[in-house]
């Protein structure tokens, strides 16, 4: 089967389609035979195409890798269960919804936890197949769903979390919701399978369905969108396929958006045809044209994106293949209007404001630091219970941040003391969290992620403990370095926008990247390859010592590494990301 498309001049067009394209074409608008698999008691998982199709419904099949070998020895299949990721544009959720979600996690998930993600939503881990319809029906009852939070669609739309400029944030959040809804699939397959629980009986039913934006075969690959309000880059906007940078009119109102496209952080070890890249500027649009711009970028990627090689199918590769000017021109043609010139903007940081902050409307917002976003009652901590107890009395809302933290938002002055008392009682407010730890992040990795090559979430606390000691040794404890660990090169931990990024290479081994910046606008350079955590700490001890002794006033670690030539900056990732001659430490090794 070869590509049949109206587009011309793309080298991949005459190559065979990837099998995922066949799968989508034959899926009956994402229904497949999922309902049949739900009735099969012989396996805890899904068979054939359904293994992939459930991803379009916001789920991944996983197993507990800690006991995989043990179960194999006992002639048992892996302990299979599902990860579910909710669709939650901007990360806002009501306390009443949270109470019900907490109950489900405790009663029906293997790990009895809720994981806050860096895409501003939550995940259930370890949900057995028999509980999936129960879970989706609960989400539906709560006004939530998980459609399009995975697979080849526009994923959960991010929006700057900290609501200091309340009116501007409200307006930006409304557009995040509108963009999310506008780019959703139109198929009823999700409802038919998970809520109604019935098969479509006639082929005529399929003739009535259409996907005017995504198309019958949806997008070539995953697609990520964010709305960001400068000067805070908490959503890491340069790592997304599509970004809307909210521009104020000077009076706290939304003037419009700068539109950026082509960011993405995944790669494949040793494959120089893959690379992370920051998003590029297309132009400015007024608010009323934001949806047109979103649709135009998505449909351009739909029609020009690589459907032969999934490793080169993201928007950044489409822009590289077409050229930025041609990509922009095609988007403008589809919008029916040209972009205006980019409006000036600047980012000054991207960490969350931990603690209490007062909004301009007089309400208070408490940002709770949640290490790696994991809410669970274990190891003497009752973080999950703490959030539940707050939810029982909170009159505002919760906001999940893109840094895996939780904001107890819109707290009245009269309720502030009680909220803080509960947070302290359950360990949600701690006095021993360093700035370094507040600015660290990890993906989930072992034991549930099937792609994990090395630990991430489970080693982050101890790794930061050791890095804190190094910071103290060199007199920099009052400062921070944006540090991220990801268990494989797929980019979920956003290590490719960190000052210090660890990327899993094999069991207990990582590639060490340095030279990103605090604002999240530069890709870090590979510094040392395939080394252990103790070896990484030894390298960082030396480098942090140099930073402490030789840095300029206010100079971050990543900027120092670039200025002093420890590594050369990644200036044009498609060309120089893999250029090891610019990784000074490797060249001299």
From Swiss-Prot:
Catalytic activity: hydrogen sulfide + 3 NADP(+) + 3 H2O = sulfite + 3 NADPH + 4 H(+)
Pathway(s) the chain acts in: Sulfur metabolism; hydrogen sulfide biosynthesis; hydrogen sulfide from sulfite (NADPH route): step 1/1
A GO BP annotation: sulfate assimilation
Primary enzyme class: oxidoreductase
Cofactor(s) it depends on: siroheme; [4Fe-4S] cluster
Binding-site residues for siroheme, renumbered to this chain: 492
One Gene Ontology cellular component: sulfite reductase complex (NADPH)
PROSITE patterns attached to this UniProt entry: NIR_SIR (PS00365)
Binding positions for [4Fe-4S] cluster per the UniProt entry: 443, 449, 488, 492
Cofactor notes: Binds 1 siroheme per subunit. Binds 1 [4Fe-4S] cluster per subunit.
Keywords in alphabetical order: 4Fe-4S, Amino-acid biosynthesis, Cysteine biosynthesis, Heme, Iron, Iron-sulfur, Metal-binding, NADP, Oxidoreductase
InterPro entries, alphabetized: CysI (IPR011786), NiRdtase/SiRdtase_haem-b_fer (IPR005117), Nit/Sulf_reduc_fer-like_dom_sf (IPR036136), NO2/SO3_Rdtase_4Fe4S_dom (IPR006067), NO2/SO3_Rdtase_4Fe4S_prot (IPR045169), NO2/SO3_Rdtase_4Fe4S_sf (IPR045854), NO2/SO3_Rdtase_FeS/sirohaem_BS (IPR006066)
Example GO molecular function: sulfite reductase (ferredoxin) activity
Pfam families from the UniProt entry: NIR_SIR (PF01077), NIR_SIR_ferr (PF03460)
HAMAP family according to UniProt: CysI (MF_01540)
Family to which this protein belongs: Belongs to the nitrite and sulfite reductase 4Fe-4S domain family.
Subunit: Alpha(8)-beta(8). The alpha component is a flavoprotein, the beta component is a hemoprotein.
Known role: Component of the sulfite reductase complex that catalyzes the 6-electron reduction of sulfite to sulfide. This is one of several activities required for the biosynthesis of L-cysteine from sulfate.
Protein name, UniProt field: Sulfite reductase [NADPH] hemoprotein beta-component
Organism listed in the record: Neisseria meningitidis serogroup C (strain 053442)
Upper taxonomic lineage: Bacteria, Pseudomonadati, Pseudomonadota, Betaproteobacteria, Neisseriales
Encoding gene per record: cysI
């Amino acid at each position: 089967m070869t590509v049949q498309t109206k587009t011309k001049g793309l080298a991949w067009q005459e190559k065979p389609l990837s099998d995922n394209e066949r799968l989508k074409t034959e899926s009956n608008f994402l229904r497949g035979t999922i309902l049949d698999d739900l009735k099969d008691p012989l396996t805890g998982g899904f068979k054939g195409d359904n293994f992939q199709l459930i991803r379009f419904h916001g789920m991944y099949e996983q197993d507990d890798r800690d006991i995989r070998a043990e179960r194999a020895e006992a002639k048992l299949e892996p302990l299979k269960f599902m990860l579910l990721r909710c669709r939650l544009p901007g990360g806002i959720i009501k306390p009443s919804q949270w109470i019900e979600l907490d109950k489900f996690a405790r009663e029906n998930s293997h790990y009895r936890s809720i994981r806050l993600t860096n895409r501003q939503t939550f995940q259930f881990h370890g949900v057995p197949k028999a509980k999936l319809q129960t879970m989706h029906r609960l989400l539906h009852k709560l006004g939530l769903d998980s459609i399009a939070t995975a697979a080849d669609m526009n994923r959960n739309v991010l929006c700057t979390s900290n609501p200091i400029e309340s009116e501007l944030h409200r307006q930006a959040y409304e557009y995040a919701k509108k963009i999310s809804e506008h780019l959703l699939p139109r198929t009823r397959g999700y409802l038919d399978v998970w809520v109604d629980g019935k098969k479509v009986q006639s082929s005529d039913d399929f003739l009535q369905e259409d996907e005017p934006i995504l198309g019958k075969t949806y997008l070539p690959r995953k697609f990520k969108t964010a709305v960001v309000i400068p000067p805070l880059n908490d959503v890491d906007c340069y790592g997304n396929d599509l970004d809307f940078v909210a521009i104020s009119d000077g009076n706290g109102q939304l003037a419009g958006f700068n539109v950026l496209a082509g960011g993405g952080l995944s790669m494949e070890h040793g494959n120089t045809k893959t690379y992370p890249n920051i998003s590029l500027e297309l132009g400015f649009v007024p608010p009323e044209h934001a949806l047109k711009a979103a649709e135009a970028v998505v449909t351009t990627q739909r029609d020009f994106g690589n459907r032969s090689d999934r490793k080169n199918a993201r928007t950044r590769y489409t822009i590289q293949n077409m050229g930025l000017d041609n990509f922009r021109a095609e988007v403008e043609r589809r919008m029916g209007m040209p972009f205006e010139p980019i409006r000036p903007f600047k980012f000054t940081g991207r960490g969350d404001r931990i603690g209490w902050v007062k909004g301009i409307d007089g309400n208070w917002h408490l940002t709770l630091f949640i290490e790696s976003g994991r809410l669970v009652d274990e190891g003497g901590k009752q973080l999950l219970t703490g959030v539940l107890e707050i939810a029982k009395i909170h009159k505002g809302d919760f906001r999940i941040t893109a840094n895996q933290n939780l904001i107890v938002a819109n707290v009245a002055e009269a309720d502030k003391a009680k909220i803080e008392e509960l947070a302290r009682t359950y360990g949600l407010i701690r006095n021993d969290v360093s700035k370094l730890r507040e600015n660290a992040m990890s993906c989930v990795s072992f034991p549930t992620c099937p792609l994990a090559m090395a630990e991430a979430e489970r080693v982050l606390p101890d790794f930061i403990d050791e890095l804190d000691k190094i910071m103290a040794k060199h007199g920099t404890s009052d400062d921070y370095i944006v540090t991220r660990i990801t268990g494989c090169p797929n980019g979920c931990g956003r290590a490719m926008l960190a000052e210090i990024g660890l990327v899993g290479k094999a069991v207990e081994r990582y590639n060490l990247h340095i030279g990103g910046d605090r604002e999240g606008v530069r890709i870090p350079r590979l510094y040392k390859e395939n080394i252990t955590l103790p070896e990484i700490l030894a390298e960082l001890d030396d480098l942090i010592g140099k930073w402490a002794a030789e840095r300029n006033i206010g100079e971050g670690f990543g900027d120092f590494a670039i200025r002093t030539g420890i590594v050369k900056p990644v200036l044009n990732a498609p060309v120089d990301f893999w250029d090891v001659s610019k990784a000074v430490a490797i060249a001299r090794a």
